[in-house]
């Protein structure tokens, strides 16, 4: 019986492949990369960029039973995602996406529709509410508390990645639930860590490439389902508490706002009504998209500054000049980047070299379209190679080097695409940029960053499956500025 089932699935897969080829006949398609060994490359975004030398900035790859189009230049990415955004606003619905998204109620993983547009409007309005009211002072307050905790560890090796992760999780907890209690922060932090670790496992990635594998035993899939049950239990508890205590017409946080708006907000006529499940998944998106991504970018920034102490010194001089010496005092002028040009340029350079999501989540065409003269049929999966676009030698001078000064000359360098662009641009970009500027500014005002035991962290991305461009674990020593002696264990 098992053999018969395998044979049937093989026949169906072959029929689907032949049907797909028949539908593409007569089209002027991008060139196809033969074979599938490219998927085994440890640094896939750079490998995909290298293929442009022979094939140009747009080509097709064979991914399981289907072809996908890869975009490797800023020009092709913006043509698709900005100028033809409706054509490329879709999202392919893979087995893991369906499972993680609470049956298509997620914003990041949801397919393009009128209901999706209403969901986006709800989440964006809640974020804008946070920016107008409490977001800015909250980030500064929690960052100041973070620096005080770090001061207690001065002179000893600090696992800064975990500290950044807890800080960003505390910010999201407070904005979403109006609470930064340590127990809740650690609960959500551990939940997100477990979910991302499970979702990025190779067995789940293979399930999305070859969907019929879901009919076979998969321990990785079982672990993912348990992680999702834990996630939903935690979020549902918070939603239930908010519904029991909120006052109509008033909102304490983003969850209050979304719960009260979800019953009334509709998109264009005929889209249907948003459900509480959409609020549930907006909360999930805020934690998954707003904690590890920002924390990882901050960790990359610290690593680059450890390798480039001359840049760190210039940043501290800029901060002292504009804000005055000391770890507190003047607020960070994040709304006016001209006051802290080197800090803004450093953030841009870190985002260019190490976009946390180097290969953007796959898009899907909603109707037949074209890119650079090539036909792109309806339903085609399209993947923007953001890191590849940031390392394009035809656009950037010496792209592999860490050179924040490239952004100091107005108009000399294009805007980075680390947060995507078009209809699918990251809604949390304003919050992420605020956190990056405030945390780095306060950290560098309070401390000088030094390598633990004189060992510099690796700047090579960690080889792993998944979405995020993670880094090797490392430690840093924080020397309080103005301290007359070196901290314990510090090397001159």
UniProtKB/Swiss-Prot annotation:
Record's catalysed reaction(s): 17alpha-hydroxyprogesterone + reduced [NADPH--hemoprotein reductase] + O2 = 11-deoxycortisol + oxidized [NADPH--hemoprotein reductase] + H2O + H(+); progesterone + reduced [NADPH--hemoprotein reductase] + O2 = 21-hydroxyprogesterone + oxidized [NADPH--hemoprotein reductase] + H2O + H(+)
GO cellular component, one term: intracellular membrane-bounded organelle
Binding sites annotated in the UniProt record for 17alpha-hydroxyprogesterone: 231
EC number: 1.14.14.16
Cofactor dependence: heme b
Disulfide links within the chain: none
Transmembrane segments: none
Keywords attached to this entry: Endoplasmic reticulum, Heme, Iron, Lipid-binding, Membrane, Metal-binding, Microsome, Monooxygenase, Oxidoreductase, Steroid-binding, Steroidogenesis
Subcellular location: Endoplasmic reticulum membrane; Microsome membrane
Domain of life: Eukaryota
Binding site for heme b: 91, 120, 363, 424, 426
Entry GO MF terms: 17-hydroxyprogesterone 21-hydroxylase activity; heme binding; iron ion binding; oxidoreductase activity, acting on paired donors, with incorporation or reduction of molecular oxygen, reduced flavin or flavoprotein as one donor, and incorporation of one atom of oxygen; progesterone 21-hydroxylase activity; steroid binding; steroid hydroxylase activity
Positions that bind progesterone: 231
UniProt membrane topology term: Peripheral membrane protein
Family indicated by similarity: Belongs to the cytochrome P450 family.
Role of this protein: Specifically catalyzes the 21-hydroxylation of steroids. Required for the adrenal synthesis of mineralocorticoids and glucocorticoids.
Domain characteristics, as noted in the entry: The leucine-rich hydrophobic amino acid N-terminal region probably helps to anchor the protein to the microsomal membrane.
Full protein name: Steroid 21-hydroxylase
Source organism of this protein record: Canis lupus familiaris (Dog)
Gene expressing this chain: CYP21
């Amino acid at each position: 019986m098992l053999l018969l089932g395998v044979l049937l699935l093989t026949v169906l897969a072959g029929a689907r492949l032949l049907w797909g080829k028949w539908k593409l006949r007569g089209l002027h398609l991008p060139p196809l990369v033969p074979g599938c060994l490219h998927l085994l490359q440890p640094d896939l975004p750079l490998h995909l960029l290298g293929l442009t030398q022979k094939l140009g900035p747009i080509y097709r790859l064979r991914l399981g039973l289907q072809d996908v189009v890869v975009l490797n230049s800023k020009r092709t990415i913006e043509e698709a995602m900005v100028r033809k955004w409706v054509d490329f606003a879709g999202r392919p619905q893979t087995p893991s996406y369906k499972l993680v998204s609470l049956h298509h109620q997620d914003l990041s993983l949801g397919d393009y529709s009128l209901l999706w547009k209403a969901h986006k409007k709800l989440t964006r309005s809640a974020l804008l509410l946070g920016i107008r009211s409490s977001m800015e002072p909250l980030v500064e307050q929690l960052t100041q508390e973070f620096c005080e905790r770090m001061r207690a560890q001065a002179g000893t090796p600090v696992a800064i990645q975990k500290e950044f992760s807890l800080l960003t999780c505390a910010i999201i907890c407070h904005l979403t639930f109006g609470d930064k209690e340590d127990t809740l922060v650690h609960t959500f932090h551990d939940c997100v860590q477990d979910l991302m670790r499970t979702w990025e496992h190779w067995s789940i990635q293979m399930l999305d490439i070859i969907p019929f594998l879901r009919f076979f035993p998969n321990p990785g899939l079982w672990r993912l389902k348990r992680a999702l049950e834990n996630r939903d239990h935690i979020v549902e508890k918070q939603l239930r508490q908010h519904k029991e205590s909120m006052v109509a017409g008033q909102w304490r946080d983003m969850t209050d706002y979304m719960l009260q708006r979800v019953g009334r907000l509709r998109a264009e006529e005929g889209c249907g009504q948003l459900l509480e499940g959409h609020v549930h998944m907006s909360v999930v998106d805020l934690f998954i998209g707003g904690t590890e991504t920002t924390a990882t970018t901050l960790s990359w920034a610290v690593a680059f500054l450890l390798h480039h102490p001359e840049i760190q010194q210039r940043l501290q001089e800029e901060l002292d000049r504009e804000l005055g010496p000391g770890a507190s005092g003047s607020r960070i002028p994040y709304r006016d980047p001209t006051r802290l040009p080197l800090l803004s340029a450093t953030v841009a350079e870190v985002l260019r070299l190490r976009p946390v999501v180097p290969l953007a989540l796959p898009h899907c065409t909603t109707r037949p379209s074209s890119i650079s003269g090539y036909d792109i049929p309806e339903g085609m999966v399209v993947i923007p190679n953001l890191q590849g676009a940031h390392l394009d030698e035809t656009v950037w001078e010496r792209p592999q080097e860490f050179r924040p000064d490239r952004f100091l000359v107005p108009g000399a360098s294009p805007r980075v695409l680390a947060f995507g662009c078009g209809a699918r641009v990251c809604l949390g970009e304003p919050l992420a940029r605020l956190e990056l500027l405030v945390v780095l500014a306060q950290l560098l005002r309070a401390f000088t960053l030094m390598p633990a035991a004189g060992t510099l962290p690796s700047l090579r991305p960690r080889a792993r499956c998944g979405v995020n461009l993670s880094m090797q674990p490392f430690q840093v020593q924080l020397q309080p500025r103005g301290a007359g002696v070196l901290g314990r264990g510090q090397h001159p």
